[in-house]
Amino acid sequence: METPKSCLTRFDRIPTRKGTRPSTICGPLHIQCSGSGDTKYVRGLITEVLTWPHVESTPPVVSSPDLISIHLKQAQGATPSSAATAVKEFAKVYLEAPAIYLTLPLVTAHWAILHGWAEPHYLASHGLMPAGTVLPYTPREESELEVCHFHFSRAYEFARESVEKKQPTTLSSPANASIFAFQERSGS
């Protein structure tokens, strides 16, 4: 698998964010109110993320420049009910707010929060979004962009791993063999 480029490779090696945490408005639309940098950093990051394997945005960035939902592509010819090919959103970005939502592995989310790079999403705190969904603070400079890039790459890897683990059992798999044996014995 092609992995996104980043010098940061481990969540426990992320530096502590400098300065105070930005102020945010907590609610269903959880947004950052202060401390955001130039949107060029986020726009550049989004452009790169959309080049990663099996990634797309809904709606396409050109039709909705303010709201970008980033997810894994649904496999060609897949049925919507198939767990293995379900669309897996791992990021949502509101460019004008500004706000980034990422669904991270719990350990990564923990370290992002602990080191001052994010806060738990309001709806995740109430069980209405997946655990590990955070509001990472938008990057103010190049060094912060690298940390934000790391968090996007972890969200991407987590989404890919989640989809791979949820593959449904097929009719020829050993898990279903007992069903067929029962049907044969009962005459069904």
Predicted feature locations:
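Charge-dense, helix-prone N-terminal extensions
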Residues: M1-S188
